[in-house]
C-alpha cells in the first residue's frame, strides 16, 4: 500500500511540518508501505518528490527543489503538480500539516472531494478545533472547564480600542494571554501585563488572524493527554511540559528546545482520571477521529482547565504525542500503523453512508 505524505504548507508552521514529516518517515514500516512525498511550498506549490521505500537520510532531503517552469529537468528533486494529481487508487493520505490550510478543515475538505482516505480528523472537527473561539463555545456547552476569556474581532478593536480594553480589563485580570484564533504551535501568542502590552499583543495576534482571543493568565502546570481512536477512544496517562521560560512559545518548542517533558506527569490519580475524562468528552463533542492531543492547565489546587485540542499534534523528536503513547507501550511505528487503519476505517464508514443514501 502507498502512503501519500503531505507536508510543508503555507502556514507559519511550515518548518514544524517538515520536522514532523521527517520523524514520521523514520517510523513507518517500509516492509508494508511505500511513501510518496508531496511537499507544499510556502508559496503554495505542490511538489511531487520521490517514492520512498526506505528511511530518508536527512530532513534536508524533504526540502524538495523544482524547476519554476514546471518542467521535469535534471538537478531538481521534485516537479510541480496540480493538487488533484495526488489522487491514486490504493493510497491513503497522511497530511502532516499544522496550522491554517493544514489542520483547519481546508485540506480535509479537499481530500474528501477527491474521495481519498486520510489520517486524522474530518472537516468539521478540524475547523472547529483549530478555531480557539469556536472550541471554547462548544466545550463550554459540554461542561469542560476553561479559563475565563474574551473573544476580540479585529474590526471591533480598530473601531473602538478603548471599549475592547475596558471589556478585557472588566472581565479579566492581568496578566492576560493574547492568541490568534486560528493558529497553532504558540505562534502569535504573547503575554500582557498592562494595557500597553495588551495593545501590542493584539497587534501581533492580528498579523496572523482577524480574530483573537484574550485569556486570563493563571499560575499553572501544563499537562497533556493523547487521544487515539474513532468511536472507540483511548487516552494516555498525562505528560507534563516542564518549562524554564515564561511561557511555552514557538521558539521554546522548536528552536531553542527550552522545555523538558515529564512522562507520566506526577499528579494525583484523581487528577489524571479527570484529565482523561475531559479529553474524551472534548474529543467526542468535537467529533474527533484518528488522533488528538488535549492540553490542560493544572493549578496548585488541582483545578483542571482545558486549554486546547490539537487534531494534528506535532510528531517531531520533541513532541509529546508519540512519546505519551510510547510510555503506554505503543511504539512509534505501531502508532503510525494504527492511525493508517483508523483513517481507512473512517473512509469505509463514510462510503457506507453515501451508499445508504443512494
Swiss-Prot record:
Major location category of this protein: cytoplasm
Transmembrane region(s): none
Residues given in the record as Mg(2+) 2 binding sites: 308, 310
Co-factor(s): Mg(2+); Mn(2+)
Pathway terms, separated by semicolons: Cell wall biogenesis; peptidoglycan biosynthesis
Enzyme class: ligase
Domain ATP-grasp: 136-341
Residues involved in Mg(2+) 1 binding: 295, 308
EC number of this enzyme: 6.3.2.4
Residue stretches in coiled coil: none
Organism domain of life: Bacteria
Location in or out of the cell: Cytoplasm
Protein family: Belongs to the D-alanine--D-alanine ligase family.
Protein name, entry field: D-alanine--D-alanine ligase
Species the sequence originates in: Enterococcus hirae (strain ATCC 9790 / DSM 20160 / JCM 8729 / LMG 6399 / NBRC 3181 / NCIMB 6459 / NCDO 1258 / NCTC 12367 / WDCM 00089 / R)
Native organism taxonomy: Bacteria, Bacillati, Bacillota, Bacilli, Lactobacillales
Amino acid at each position: 500500500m502507498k502512503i501519500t505524505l503531505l507536508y510543508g504548507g503555507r502556514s507559519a508552521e511550515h518548518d514544524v511540518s517538515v520536522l514532523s514529516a521527517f520523524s514520521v518517515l523514520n517510523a513507518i514500516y517500509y516492509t508494508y508501505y511505500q511513501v510518496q512525498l508531496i511537499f507544499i511550498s510556502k508559496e503554495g506549490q505542490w511538489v511531487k518528490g520521490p517514492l520512498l521505500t526506505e528511511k530518508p537520510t536527512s530532513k534536508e532531503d524533504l526540502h524538495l527543489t523544482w524547476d519554476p517552469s514546471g518542467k521535469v529537468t535534471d538537478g531538481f528533486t521534485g516537479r510541480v503538480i496540480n493538487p488533484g494529481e495526488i489522487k491514486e487508487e490504493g493510497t491513503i493520505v497522511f497530511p502532516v500539516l499544522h496550522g491554517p490550510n493544514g489542520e483547519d478543515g481546508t485540506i480535509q475538505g479537499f481530500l474528501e472531494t477527491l474521495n481519498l482516505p486520510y489520517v486524522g480528523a474530518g472537516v468539521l472537527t478540524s475547523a472547529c478545533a483549530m478555531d480557539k473561539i469556536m472550541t471554547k463555545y462548544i466545550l463550554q456547552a459540554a461542561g469542560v472547564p476553561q479559563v475565563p476569556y474574551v473573544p476580540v474581532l479585529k474590526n471591533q478593536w480598530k473601531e473602538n480600542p478603548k471599549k475592547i480594553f475596558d471589556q478585557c480589563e472588566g472581565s479579566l485580570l492581568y496578566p492576560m494571554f493574547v492568541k490568534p484564533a486560528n493558529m497553532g504551535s504558540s505562534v502569535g501568542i504573547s503575554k500582557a501585563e498592562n494595557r500597553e502590552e495588551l495593545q501590542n499583543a493584539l497587534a501581533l495576534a492580528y498579523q496572523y488572524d482577524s480574530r483573537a482571543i484574550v485569556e486570563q493568565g493563571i499560575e499553572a502546570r501544563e499537562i497533556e493527554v493523547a487521544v487515539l481512536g474513532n468511536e472507540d477512544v483511548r487516552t494516555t496517562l498525562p505528560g507534563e511540559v516542564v518549562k524554564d521560560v515564561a511561557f511555552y512559545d514557538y521558539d521554546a518548542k522548536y528552536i531553542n528546545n527550552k522545555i523538558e517533558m515529564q512522562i507520566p506527569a506526577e499528579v494525583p490519580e484523581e487528577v489524571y482520571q479527570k484529565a482523561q475524562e475531559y479529553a474524551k468528552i472534548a474529543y467526542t463533542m468535537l467529533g474527533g477521529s484518528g488522533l488528538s492531543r488535549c492540553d490542560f492547565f493544572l493549578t496548585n489546587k488541582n483545578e483542571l482547565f482545558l486549554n486546547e485540542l490539537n487534531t494534528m499534534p506535532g510528531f517531531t523528536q520533541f513532541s509529546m504525542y508519540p512519546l505519551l503513547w510510547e510510555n503506554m507501550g505503543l511504539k512509534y511505528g505501531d502508532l503510525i500503523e494504527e492511525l493508517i487503519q483508523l483513517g481507512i476505517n473512517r473512509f469505509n464508514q463514510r462510503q457506507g453512508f453515501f451508499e445508504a443514501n443512494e
